[in-house]
Swiss-Prot record:
Its EC number is 5.3.1.5. It comes from Escherichia coli O45:K1 (strain S88 / ExPEC). One of its GO terms (molecular function) is magnesium ion binding. The gene is xylA. Keywords: Carbohydrate metabolism, Cytoplasm, Isomerase, Magnesium, Metal-binding, Xylose metabolism. The active site is at H101, D104. One of its GO terms (cellular component) is cytoplasm. Its cofactor is Mg(2+). This is Xylose isomerase. Homotetramer. Binds 2 magnesium ions per subunit. Belongs to the xylose isomerase family. GO terms for biological process: D-xylose metabolic process. Mg(2+) 1 binds at E232, E268, D296, D339. Mg(2+) 2 binds at E268, H271, D307, D309.
Length: 440
């Protein structure tokens, strides 16, 4: 079959002096960073949905792209053609992983039976493509938000029959992920929320969602899936308010239903923006709560109130993100999935490469800067100094539960405590970070 991207062999590393827009300037898969190959640190993945499913349509306009697999035709044949192009793209881009929703890779069909049969055929196709290319599945998931049946949610739907249909999709998608050797399974509650409280029973919907997640965990263990289950927080869009608002909110939900040891988080940069947080904040929070799993690497627009899903291009922002990830030991089953799309005006097929190449170079340079920060150790040293009082006898007694509130009040009076505020030195630390970013 003729190559779709016939003007490109493979994207290669040419170094920072290169002016070739179809070459990496910073991402060298084999370069050692802190003793490990860059490819193993970053674990890049390209997503199926934005890259091969979106046709350029938006709220105000029809599809703008001319993709051969999006033309009228037999649905399964078009899905197979899309898979051909997708794996050509993954290979030429040098990404070791990819991600998908069930209906990204397979026609949904007109019934559950058709859905299951179509998906089974496409899983066999994907398995063959993975074996040929060496590209692996980072994670799979089920799209339980696009079809009109999910207008009021999937797990939180007022109709238990819709809940059951969603369960069928998740069972099928998780088993497909398991068969394909996927390293994670993601749950994103696109419509698990509400438009108005006038027709919403918050307690009922929360209980439904909690039970659904418990069943997901049960099924994972039943089929022997060894990957990580991941929830992807998002505050709103398409609903007014979603129940997986941010990392801290999801932690409370998981604790309520006894799932905090079973499910981790897939943090998306643009979702952090929508929640009023920095990407850095959401990553650091997930790590602090013991829930960090994987990343959807993209960016939003602080001046817009919706998910723009642009490619990451801020080394400054992502250096601090990679610093947190490296401090936490790096990825295990997770990775950096580019949940990002070219702009509607970017109609040339090679724009798909430009977007991903820039994003991969951004994250590679961010990784190298973060590694310098780790090796230097100055930021960690400053934080350790700031909290050093908690290593004292008093601090340890408080943390170990050896002193009550009344004990502390007595201690403060007996020792005539008069603590003096110590400077947080924020400006100095910001200058230090700029040193890592901009000084060679």
């Amino acid at each position: 079959m003729q190559a779709y991207f016939d003007q490109l062999d493979r994207v290669r590393y040419e170094g920072s002096k290169s002016s070739n827009p179809l070459a990496f300037r910073h991402y060298n898969p084999d370069e050692l960073v802190l003793g490990k190959r860059m490819e193993e640190h970053l674990r890049f993945a390209a997503c199926y949905w934005h890259t091969f499913c979106w046709n350029g349509a938006d709220m105000f306009g029809v599809g703008a792209f001319n993709r051969p697999w999006q033309q009228p035709g037999e649905a399964l044949a078009l899905a197979k053609r899309k898979a051909d192009v997708a794996f050509e793209f993954f290979h030429k881009l040098h990404v070791p992983f990819y991600c998908f929703h069930d209906v990204d890779v397979s026609p949904e069909g007109a019934s559950l039976k058709e859905y299951i049969n179509n998906f089974a055929q496409m899983v066999d196709v994907l398995a063959g493509k993975q074996e040929e290319s060496g590209v692996k599945l980072l994670w799979g998931t089920a799209n339980c938000f696009t079809n009109p049946r999910y207008g009021a949610g999937a797990a939180t739907n007022p109709d238990p029959e819709v809940f059951s249909w969603a369960a069928t999709q998740v069972v099928t998608a998780m088993e497909a992920t398991h068969k394909l050797g996927g390293e994670n399974y993601v749950l994103w509650g696109g419509r698990e929320g509400y438009e108005t409280l006038l027709n919403t029973d918050l307690r009922q919907e929360r209980e439904q969602l909690g039970r659904f997640m418990q069943m997901v965990v049960e099924h994972k263990h039943k089929i022997g899936f060894q990957g990580t289950l991941l929830i992807e927080p998002k505050p709103q869009e398409p609903t007014k308010h979603q129940y997986d608002y941010d990392a801290a909110t999801v932690y409370g939900f998981l604790k309520q239903f006894g799932l905090e040891k079973e499910i981790k988080l897939n943090i998306e940069a643009n979702h952090a923006t929508l929640a009023g947080h920095s990407f850095h904040h959401e990553i650091a929070t997930a790590i602090a709560l013991g829930l960090f799993g994987s990343v959807d690497a993209n960016r939003g627009d602080a001046q817009l109130g919706w998910d723009t899903d642009q490619f990451p291009n801020s080394v400054e922002e992502n250096a601090l993100v990679m610093y947190e990830i490296l401090k936490a030991g790096g990825f295990t089953t997770g990775g950096l999935n580019f949940d990002a799309k070219v702009r509607r005006q970017s109609t040339d097929k090679y724009d798909l490469f430009y977007g991903h190449i820039g994003a991969m170079d951004t994250m590679a340079l961010a990784l190298k800067i973060a590694a310098r920060m780790i090796e230097d150790g100055e930021l960690d040293k400053r934080i350790a100094q700031r909290y050093s009082g908690w290593n004292s006898e008093l601090g340890q007694q408080i943390l170990k539960g050896q002193m009550s509130l009344a004990d502390l009040a007595k201690y403060a009076q007996e020792h005539n405590l008069s603590p003096v505020h110590q400077s947080g030195r924020q400006e100095q630390l910001e200058n230090l970070v700029n040193h890592y970013l901009f000084d060679k």
